[in-house]
Amino acid sequence: MAVAAATRIAVVVVVLALAVLAPAARGLRRDDFPPGFLFGAATSAYQIEGAYLDDNKGLNNWDVFTHTQAGRISDGRNGDVADDHYHRYTEDVDILHNLGVNSYRFSISWARILPRGRLGGVNSAGIAFYNRLINALLQKGIQPFVTLNHFDIPHELETRYGGWLGAAIREEFEYYSDVCFNAFGDRVRFWTTFNEPNLSTRHQYILGEFPPNHCSPPFGNCSSGDSRREPYAAAHNILLSHAAAVHNYKTNYQAKQGGSIGIVIAVKWYEPLTNSTEDVRAARRALAFEVDWFLDPIFFGDYPREMREILSSNLPKFTPEEKKLLQNNKVDFIGINHYTAIYAKDCIYSPCTLDTYEGNALVYAIGRRNGKIIGKPTALHGYFVVPEAMEKVVMYVNDRYRNTTIYITENGYSQHSDTSMEDLINDVERVNYMHDYLKYLSSAIRKGANVGGYFAWSIVDNFEWVYGYTVKFGLYQVDFDTQERIPRMSAKWYRDFLTSSSLTDGLQVRSRRADS
């Protein structure tokens, strides 16, 4: 153990030296971003908190899923302990403070606040934990940026209503959000209702990878589900839950608390596979099914034309009253989680295998064109390094949704957990990824995009859903046996970028041996 610890320390020392000596040719300054710009890091409750039964917390859907279907997780593990953030939050707040960020994005565990939903009573211990976390952040000058729902719901709501497939869950979410606004809103200036509902519903109800694991052919062979209908029924209930929460916040809390509220959407950029009209339209159609699916109803009161034409009766319809609720309660900002880009091939006029989640859009997504890959692969399947896509995504959302303020609420680089310790710590690829994506973000801002902040995913390695602990996104390496947090080269680079007025650059050097 002593030898291993000494090796880790030696690696960290070399990492810091490499970061200090890195060349600064292309240049990126914090001053390239507007005054008041938020720079932070992000996490979510299930992925880092642990303490899955502590202090009267109820079981959530991921607790049950990872315990009953461990074979669906790459390493068979779960979030029972994860980063033990519930007990180590003060250490993690200190890490954030030392990093120099001015905001921290985290989510609240619904089952920690309302273990059985609105019928079971509020858990005072859950309220107390998030009060302690929020207060600790504010004492360090860090703004909480709070997500109400990041994939996890109380298990009882899954069994009682069928989760997001049941319309009754809308009232549950409105009640839960009200409890949070009332308990924490005097200190929270940034709220988001949902994280990536456009991604979670597809993994839940098209591919069947996330609980409740519903799907149908050609996407999979689940025991139940309808991949053509259920994702859109669930999304419909999420959108109306969102609208009810936003209406409540704007009516009863915003004026006296002074905060803002939005929603976070996962945005993958789609490039046409060829220059053909069909593939150009396919790329546009993929974006409609990716982005416009949730944002068009919020801004324009209805689903995009492409979805209505293709899905027909499988796409629910809003009543006039529901359209009014959506349009009269627009978000104050849009959160974008952006990581990658991919090619889009038309499947209306060309034969395709429609088994990716773009299949319902009659699009086939592929990472290669003419034998050349779109960007360097990362540890997540289908995720490539394509920095210029950041600018394209931001400009698309900015232009379509009327210059509404945008926050990049997630952006990060994944490594395989079986990478050598030296390369995990000397994460040159992550440094270059962050530098290059930030450069294209600053370019979008110069072109007029209204962007208010950037959050790196993630501050620490954590439980990465069906990948378990087999991939690592953290600026800090975590030893899950000891819970030791070890700064990576990317943490040093990010801190230098945030605290220095001088030019910083990506590291165009290769990792060196720790003992060289």
Curated annotation (Swiss-Prot):
An annotated Gene Ontology molecular function: beta-glucosidase activity
Residues the record lists as binding a beta-D-glucoside: Q47, H150, N195, E196, Y339, E410, W457, E464, W465, F473
Protein EC: 3.2.1.21
pH dependence of function: Optimum pH is 6.5 with para-nitrophenyl beta-D-glucopyranoside (pNPGlc) as substrate.
Glycosylated position list: N198, N221, N275, N403
InterPro entries noted in UniProt: Glyco_hydro_1 (IPR001360), Glyco_hydro_1_N_CS (IPR033132), Glycoside_hydrolase_SF (IPR017853)
Active site (catalytic residues): E196 (proton donor), E410 (nucleophile)
Temperature dependence comment: Optimum temperature is 45 degrees Celsius with para-nitrophenyl beta-D-glucopyranoside (pNPGlc) as substrate.
PROSITE patterns: GLYCOSYL_HYDROL_F1_2
Reaction catalysis annotation: Hydrolysis of terminal, non-reducing beta-D-glucosyl residues with release of beta-D-glucose
Tissues expressing the protein: Expressed in leaves, stems and endosperm.
Source superkingdom: Eukaryota
Pfam families according to UniProt: Glyco_hydro_1
Disulfide-linked positions: C215-C222, C347-C352
Signal sequence residues: 1-27
Enzyme type, top EC level: hydrolase
GO biological process, one term: coniferin metabolic process
Database matches in SUPFAM superfamilies: (Trans)glycosidases
Keywords: Disulfide bond, Glycoprotein, Glycosidase, Hydrolase, Signal
UniProt function note: Hydrolyzes glycosides and monolignol glucosides. Can hydrolyze para-nitrophenyl beta-D-glucopyranoside (pNPGlc) in vitro. Hydrolyzes para-nitrophenyl beta-D-fucopyranoside, para-nitrophenyl beta-D-galactopyranoside and para-nitrophenyl beta-D-xylopyranoside in vitro. Hydrolyzes the monolignol glucosides coniferin and syringin with high catalytic efficiencies.
Family the entry assigns: Belongs to the glycosyl hydrolase 1 family.
Protein name: Beta-glucosidase 16
Organism expressing this protein natively: Oryza sativa subsp. japonica (Rice)
